[in-house]
């Protein structure tokens, strides 16, 4: 499995100095990508804020739509897809030669109410399959990597109780990765979660990876969400998680 490292920053106002120092992406170009998220829904950054876009394009080498590709925004009604904001971010990323991380195809949060009202399990499965197909197809050749499944684990390493687990069974993760791979065998596919520095949760993620690999289902990367501060986790815990 390929090791791909990103360092992501949520946007914060920056004070520009008169000199032009080496940019962040130039400084770390030989080590890893420097990533930023763009929240188009709340701030309309692509439409309104050229200063922020200038900072993002000059200092960052990767971009992630914070909300635009999530189910609530991309597939708000049963038969309705809305890609306008996601497309704006995609165009910005490609125009600036940036790596684009698609986030996310299957997540228990920010899901429209209609999804949980689909009572027939076979129809639910087909709906998830179509959701993945539509998003991956729409951004095929543009998105470099998809977070296929996001935050499927509890901190004890067990699968989180979600509508996807209830309606598709405990192999719903395998199905999601297979659907994504079938739609675009060239895009990179990732599982993404937080608190993976905790041993039990990390073991759960490893079980997911091993299960996929044993069944011949492709997974290329694991996203480690860095919701950290100066006090935790320790450097040792971070290193153990990465290794």
Feature locations, PLM:
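Glycoside hydrolase catalytic-domain groove-lining segments
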Residues: 91-99, 167-189, 202-243
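Bacterial Sec-dependent N-terminal signal peptides
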Residues: 1-24
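Substrate-binding cleft and catalytic face of glycoside hydrolase catalytic domains
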Residues: 21-22, 58-76, 85-197
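Acidic-and-aromatic substrate-binding clefts and catalytic sites of carbohydrate-active enzymes
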Residues: 38-49, 71-84, 153-155, 196-204, ...
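Boundary/entry segment of secreted carbohydrate-active catalytic domains
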Residues: 19-62, 66
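Short, glycine/charged-enriched secondary-structure capping and boundary segments
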Residues: 50-51, 77-79, 115-117, 159-163, ...
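Short, acidic/polar
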Residues: 42-59, 125-136, 201-212, 237-241
């Amino acid at each position: 499995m390929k090791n791909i490292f990103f360092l992501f920053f949520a946007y914060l106002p920056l004070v520009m100095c008169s000199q032009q120092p080496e940019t962040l992406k130039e400084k770390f170009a030989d080590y890893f990508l420097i990533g930023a998220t763009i929240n188009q829904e709340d701030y309309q950054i692509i439409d309104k804020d050229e200063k922020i876009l200038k900072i993002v394009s000059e200092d960052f080498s990767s971009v992630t739509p914070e909300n635009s590709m999530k189910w609530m925004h991309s597939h708000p009604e049963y038969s309705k897809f809305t890609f306008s904001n996601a497309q704006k971010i995609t165009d910005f990323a490609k125009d600036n030669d940036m790596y684009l991380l698609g986030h996310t195809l299957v997540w228990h949060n920010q899901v429209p109410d209609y999804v949980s009202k689909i009572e027939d399990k076979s129809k639910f499965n087909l709906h998830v399959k179509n959701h993945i197909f539509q998003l991956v197809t729409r951004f095929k050749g543009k998105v470099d990597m998809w977070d296929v499944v996001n935050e499927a684990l509890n901190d004890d390493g067990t699968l989180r109780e979600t509508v996807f687990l209830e309606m598709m069974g405990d192999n719903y993760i395998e199905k999601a990765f297979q659907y994504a791979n079938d739609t675009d065998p060239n895009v990179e596919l990732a599982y993404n979660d937080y608190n993976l520095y905790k041993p039990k949760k990390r073991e759960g993620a490893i079980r997911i990876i091993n299960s996929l690999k044993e069944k011949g289902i492709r997974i290329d990367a694991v996203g480690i969400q860095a919701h950290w501060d100066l006090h935790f986790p320790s450097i040792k815990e971070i290193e153990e998680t990465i290794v």
